[in-house]
Amino acid sequence: MRTGMAGKEQKSYIAIDLKSFYASVECKERKLDPMTTNLVVADKSRTEKTICLAVSPSLKSYGIPGRARLFEVVQKVKEVNKRRICMAPGKKFAGASVDNEEIKLHPELELDYITAVPRMALYMKCSTEIYNIYLKYVAPEDIHVYSIDEVFMDVTDYLNTYRMTARELAGKIIREIQQETSIAATAGIGTNLYLCKVAMDIVAKHIEPDQNGVRIAELTEISYRKLLWAHQPITDFWRVGPGYAKKLAEVGLFTMGDVARCSLGKPGEYYNEDLLYRLFGVNAELLIDHAWGWEPCTIADVKAYKPENNSMGAGQVLHCPYNFEQTKIVVKEMIDQLALDLVDKRLVTDQIVLTIGYDIKNLEQGTKKNVGEITTDWYGRKLPKHAHGTANLKQHTSSSRLMTQAGVKLYHEIVNPDLLIRRITMAANHVISEKEVQEEQQYEQMNLFTDFGIAKKEKEEKNEKLEREKKMQKAMLDIKKKYGKNAILKGMNLQEDGTAMERNRQIGGHKA
């Protein structure tokens, strides 16, 4: 058994990322090479402002980011072709190609690309096939699925069994993925979860592939400090977003090495860990640990974690700005679906949370609206501040009727009826199982003036009404599961401004 400096067993973790996963699946379906085919996964029927789910590696080589908006792809390809036509014989294109190797060899060809409509069910099927490959080598309790295209594996106890190093095992798994699915992958290996993630995200992207075309990077705490303490931008590191980077830059910290040195400062010095805690609160502890390459959390810890408060919800971006009454239809649909989800999972809630995001068109010149407080979005655009509120229910429930009553009342209380709306987020808080509610002791305040016979009868009638509604909800779920989500609908779903029917054809907000 290998041991670390503190006498503890030294762990071996592998992180695997499927390269441009959605784009690679689309290329595979078309029998095209994912590494040389210019392809984006995006629904162009949603206008060119739609975000691309994936961009193939060859198209990325022209400076297109992985999560570009479609209009950015269109603009960049136009720029490339503007330069190419100057070098084309007779300043004229003889044709077009989506094959990047062909484009490199033939200056007379126009750069072209495929726009593939998202097919989420297909991607989930392929991801499941790849997960089954992981299971050939590692037990499910030692795998953490981070996303549809990324996993972490604790391979500590497998290396002696397979008589392999972590690098050899990672290479074997990746080669099998490529042979079985034609999808390329990269891997990071580390002595903790953070290091394997950073090795994959940063180091593997900048190394040459091995003889099999596979990129695998390894990091230990020491090699991490040598290689990455000076790395910029700091946003390349896991969990360091633009907000963190901005706060750090304002106090003169630009790298993980800077953060690590700051944490060593003595009391009374400007740069010390107190500065980081003032900036980030308790999150500073995690940032300092990561700056040093430390991460105590294991996959077993991740699997065992149970949050103190459970919630579930959904959000959607409307395809065009909706007015107050139009949005109310969608809010009611979302509450109804949330109630069905609770019934399906045998859960109940006692609080609804609603967030409404307004559209930037509310601030267009010539509009005379009381927009209230103005804020700035992620893209630096001015827009009215979102509306947010909670509605407490009198009891834990999954009743669509009770939840809708509370949700619509909340909607009227918090939303500005004069403004156009673009985003809706609906959540159920304090979610617990039906069994937990049944086990809870119920208390009631007694008084001399209540007719408890009438009160008991009213309570029984109320419970009967709720039970009838639940039976109806369960029947609807059975029909939807057997014949499809649109097999049974409510009248409101057939209204022109309803979105439920279209959402039912989607997975994760994208076409199934």
Language-model segments: residues:
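Gly/Gly-Pro- and Ser/Thr-rich, intrinsically disordered tail segments characteristic of DNA damage-repair
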Residues: 1-299, 448, 455-512
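DNA-contacting surface of Y-family translesion DNA polymerases
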Residues: 6-8, 15, 236, 242-421, ...
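Generic "edge-of-domain/loop-turn" microfeature
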Residues: 46, 160, 194, 317, ...
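Short aromatic/hydrophobic contact patches that present stacked aromatics
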Residues: 152, 392, 425
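Short, internal active-site loops enriched in acidic
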Residues: 156-158, 191-196, 356-363, 429-435, ...
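Hydrophobic, well-ordered secondary-structure elements that form the walls
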Residues: 354, 426, 484
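C-terminal hydrophobic structural anchor segments
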Residues: 409, 413-478
